[in-house]
Design a protein with these regions (language model features):
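Short, hydrophobic transmembrane alpha-helix segments
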Residues: 76-90
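Membrane-proximal soluble regions of multi-pass membrane proteins
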Residues: 190-192, 196-228
């Protein structure tokens, strides 16, 4: 634990990066002492939780992921016992994605720019691992969607439409989770290391909703719109993001066509 009134070296470095942006991120009346006091609270917290400025303790990415996986196992097992068959793994995945995504957005949606800065700068080694696990699982879930759609093709009556709609909803859940993960990643890249890197064409510092705008725009159009990416690291991240978004978009379109054709037939 770091004594009150002192700041670890890594946070001094991060502070200098943030300070270099000056009015670009600081709000009127904010002092260096206030930021240092907040940073000390971060350093003193146990690894599973940190304290957001002016708010309650915030769970780490690892905690969110573990809780979500636990909920998925329980839900998927219950679905299998209830007779869901091949759809049970996909039900488990949907529960994981909904729990993790809902937890994230309930935490970050109302954060202002200052709180977004603090949250994004928070050191959490489990974040990168959580990103890899979630993105990999989201892409793998497309296989489960294919299995459900094949089963829907051999089903009859209302069950056919129910399975097709379930497949479409599952792809949408995976699609949303992918862009949620990249929303958090863009915020981390912007506020840590080399500060900045994304020009939102305004003087106010960006919050998570601004990064969500960038992330979901890439997810829907495979390109940036009225924001300018200014660093190689963020540009390469955006390239990977667009590359992952394409198969998800294709599957959503294909699933929608399959559902509409089934309803028309």
């Amino acid at each position: 634990m770091i004594p009150q009134g002192t700041v670890s070296h890594r946070w001094r470095v991060s502070y200098r990066h943030a300070e270099s942006m000056g009015a670009h991120w600081q709000q009127p009346g904010q002092s260096r002492t206030r930021l240092e006091r907040t940073v000390c609270q971060h350093d003193a917290m146990p690894p599973e939780f940190v304290t957001s400025p002016g708010g309650p303790r915030v769970a780490t990415a690892r905690t969110k992921l573990l809780v979500s996986v636990g909920a998925a196992i329980v839900g998927g097992t219950a679905a299998a016992v209830a007779g869901a068959g091949r759809a049970a793994p996909l039900i488990g995945w949907d529960i994981l994605a909904l729990v993790f995504g809902g937890w994230v957005w309930s935490t970050v949606w109302r954060l202002d720019a200052e709180s977004t800065t603090s949250d994004a700068m928070r050191e959490d080694p489990s974040r990168d691992l959580a990103d890899v696990v979630l993105l990999g699982a989201a892409m793998a879930s497309l296989i489960a969607v294919g299995v459900v759609l094949i089963a829907a093709g051999h089903a009859s009556g209302d069950l056919k439409y129910l399975q097709a709609a379930f497949g479409l909803a599952s792809v949408f859940v995976s699609w949303t989770l992918v862009h949620t993960v990249f929303t958090l990643k863009y915020a981390r890249l912007y506020y840590t290391g080399q500060p900045g890197g994304i020009d939102f064409n305004e003087t106010d510092a960006p919050d998570y909703r601004d990064f969500a705008y960038l992330s979901f725009t890439i997810g829907m159009t495979f390109q940036v719109s009225d924001t300018n990416i200014q660093t190689k690291q963020i540009r390469r991240t955006a390239l990977r993001h667009a590359w992952l978004s394409f198969p998800l978009g294709v599957v959503i379109i294909a699933t929608t066509i399959n559902l509409v054709a089934g309803l028309a037939g």
